């Protein structure tokens, strides 16, 4: 196994855990806020998708498919308080966009050689992803960080623990 394979394992495990937590949640349940001021899962999914798109596109320009028209504008810090489902995408729509972005991330990763992972990231992301390995690895850890919050929402909604 090489470094790229190890990063892919992390991305695949993040998808497995995240999609496991999301599997039986309804669109309405994705709007549940676990605490006052906390972001609901629908917004978090949009945020994760926009973040992955921007970060991977910054290290591998032209590698990511375009986000649907208006997508990024629906999932900004300013829209985190939106609870109106008419202003947001459904779980099915979000996962479809996520799957397209993740497939592109994996394709871009597969084109690299291990030495590429040491390349310095663009200035805009260097504070949290100093090199390309960090930029790619962050996609899995970011997803898992949010998935930990989804586990709490699941328990609040009466769902059993999964993992």
Each model region followed by its residue ranges:
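Basic/polar N-terminal segments that are highly enriched at the extreme N-terminus
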Residues: 1-5
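Short, contiguous alpha-helical
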Residues: 8-12, 16-19, 29-78, 122-163
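Hydrophobic alpha-helical core bundles mediating ligand binding, dimerization, or RNAP-core interactions
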Residues: 11, 15-18, 22, 98, ...
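A structural signal for long alpha-helical coiled-coils and helix-turn connectors
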Residues: 26, 110-113, 154
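Acidic/histidine-rich alpha-helical segments that form the ligand environment
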Residues: 77-119, 134-139
